[in-house]
Amino acid sequence: MPIARRAALAAAFAVFVLAPFARAQIAPPRTVEELKAETQARADRNAYPLIGIKPADARAALAEIKTLDRDEWAAAWSRVAARYETDAKAAEAAGRIDEAKAGYLMAWRLYSFARWPTPNSPGKQTAYAQALEAFAHYARLLDPAPTLVRIPFEGKEIVGWLRLPKGGHAGAPAPLVLTISALDSRKEDNVERSEAFIRRGIATFSLDMPGTGQAPFKGDIGSERMFSRALDYVATRPEIDAKRVVVQGVSWSGYWSAKLAIVERERLRGAVVQGGPIHYYFQPEWQTKALGTREYLFDLFPARASVYGVATLDEFLAYGPRMSLKAQALIDNPSAPMLLVNGEHDSQVPIADLDLMLHAGSAKEAWVNPAGAHTGRSADWPDGKIFAKVVAPWIARQLGLGE
């Protein structure tokens, strides 16, 4: 990394460190009209978190929203989702399977956005349950269809979707990508995007990260043990080559990917850490700045706080520092190969975390978009292009499949 950029980063974090802790506050949210306009704009350009949602459907839902009430938001998007779900059931009953599959997929996306970014109201909790139901209908129509796996674990269970490529058998087991959902995405999103891996003969096992979805517990030191247990399970499946496994984490889940690369390095061929927090992200000085970013659509603090299971800003700021890989004395340890990805202008996770990880421990590879925001995305490098041109080829190489 150029010395000038390092110096700039150091200076920036010096400013954060000197910022008075007493001034910690959350920036005011968008007004309802601002939120509606920004939501529609993102739908129009197929941008996160509305990727795959039709602009016309966004307009229909937003037309019914008059306030920032979470249940009103959930109900408006759910009504649009329900129309797709009803049509999909009718199409399936009539034997129009492709039409049904497309309808269930749209219902899943819309119900899931109804609960976005976290199901923190009764209406959003209902929307999440409906999203899971719609996705289950979609999943059973996929070819090959994924299997919902439930692994007993510490009196609870780890719930994940395992999708195996066609033609796999014990004599030629498939390599696997362990995909971990992020702060506001869910494991089902990764199943939806698994086709690129399946076509290459790569299996996927998709899990929610701690503190989200159906994960068995909140995010804390040691929560990575759920993924270690998942790797144990993978090793019992004859269809999977447990010696060829890569873990993929995007945004918050990049943290778990990085940690697994260290603590499970003997069992991993590699780890993708795309926009993942490492150390600086967890410091109060960064959070008091980043919680006000307009890069995030809305409700960033409730989403982040729910990962830890805390309610107040003070609790949240006090909880975070212990999660740092530097504070846990892990960052300098040997690791499995890592691909670090992010954008220079990420306002959600500091680019300094990528720099810190890159220059610690084992040798790593990095891809940084100089014009990129969170996870590296920009107009020239949307999410899909980063995956297709950067992440997927790297994973294939680590699994011995070339590009």
Segments the model singles out, each with a brief description of its role:
Residues 77, 81, 120, 126-170:
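N-terminal cap/lid segment of alpha/beta-hydrolase-fold proteins
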Residues 171-182:
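Short beta-strand element of the alpha/beta-hydrolase
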Residues 189, 196, 218-239:
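Alpha/beta-hydrolase active-site loop
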Residues 239-251:
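Alpha/beta-hydrolase fold nucleophile elbow
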Residues 262-318, 336:
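Hydrolase active-site cap/lid region
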Residues 334-335, 340-342:
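Short beta-strand/loop motif that positions the catalytic acidic residue
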Residues 347-353:
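Conserved alpha/beta-hydrolase "acid-adjacent" motif
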Residues 372-385:
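Catalytic histidine-centered segment of alpha/beta-hydrolase-like enzymes
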